[in-house]
């Protein structure tokens, strides 16, 4: 299973969080709880700004 780990910036609280680019579950911000990623069956639909690719596989 190839995919990237991505650092995403939360638009609501300025938190940065690392998540898997092909997330199978909804990913919420650990600080404020807003949705950062929604699964789509492939690449996740990101709801924040991508800051960096932490690890590319």
UniProtKB/Swiss-Prot annotation:
<keyword id="KW-0479">Metal-binding</keyword>
<dbReference type="InterPro" id="IPR011332">
    <property type="entry name" value="Ribosomal_zn-bd"/>
</dbReference>
<keyword id="KW-0863">Zinc-finger</keyword>
<feature type="binding site">
    <location>
        <position position="13"/>
    </location>
    <ligand>
        <name>Zn(2+)</name>
    </ligand>
</feature>
<dbReference type="GO" id="GO:0003735">
    <property type="term" value="F:structural constituent of ribosome"/>
</dbReference>
<comment type="subunit">
    <text>Part of the 30S ribosomal subunit.</text>
</comment>
<dbReference type="GO" id="GO:0008270">
    <property type="term" value="F:zinc ion binding"/>
</dbReference>
<dbReference type="InterPro" id="IPR000592">
    <property type="entry name" value="Ribosomal_eS27"/>
</dbReference>
<dbReference type="GO" id="GO:1990904">
    <property type="term" value="C:ribonucleoprotein complex"/>
</dbReference>
<feature type="zinc finger region" description="C4-type">
    <location>
        <begin position="10"/>
        <end position="32"/>
    </location>
</feature>
<dbReference type="GO" id="GO:0006412">
    <property type="term" value="P:translation"/>
</dbReference>
<keyword id="KW-0687">Ribonucleoprotein</keyword>
<comment type="similarity">
    <text>Belongs to the eukaryotic ribosomal protein eS27 family.</text>
</comment>
<feature type="binding site">
    <location>
        <position position="10"/>
    </location>
    <ligand>
        <name>Zn(2+)</name>
    </ligand>
</feature>
<dbReference type="GO" id="GO:0005840">
    <property type="term" value="C:ribosome"/>
</dbReference>
<feature type="binding site">
    <location>
        <position position="29"/>
    </location>
    <ligand>
        <name>Zn(2+)</name>
    </ligand>
</feature>
<keyword id="KW-0689">Ribosomal protein</keyword>
<feature type="binding site">
    <location>
        <position position="32"/>
    </location>
    <ligand>
        <name>Zn(2+)</name>
    </ligand>
</feature>
<protein>
    <recommendedName>
        <fullName>Small ribosomal subunit protein eS27</fullName>
    </recommendedName>
</protein>
<dbReference type="Pfam" id="PF01667">
    <property type="entry name" value="Ribosomal_S27e"/>
</dbReference>
<keyword id="KW-0862">Zinc</keyword>
<dbReference type="InterPro" id="IPR023407">
    <property type="entry name" value="Ribosomal_eS27_Zn-bd_dom_sf"/>
</dbReference>
């Amino acid at each position: 299973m190839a995919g990237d780990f991505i650092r995403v910036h939360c638009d609501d609280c300025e938190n940065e969080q690392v998540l898997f680019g092909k997330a199978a579950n909804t990913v919420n911000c650990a600080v404020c709880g807003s949705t950062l990623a929604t699964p789509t069956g492939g690449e996740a639909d990101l709801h924040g700004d991508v800051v960096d690719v932490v690890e590319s596989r």
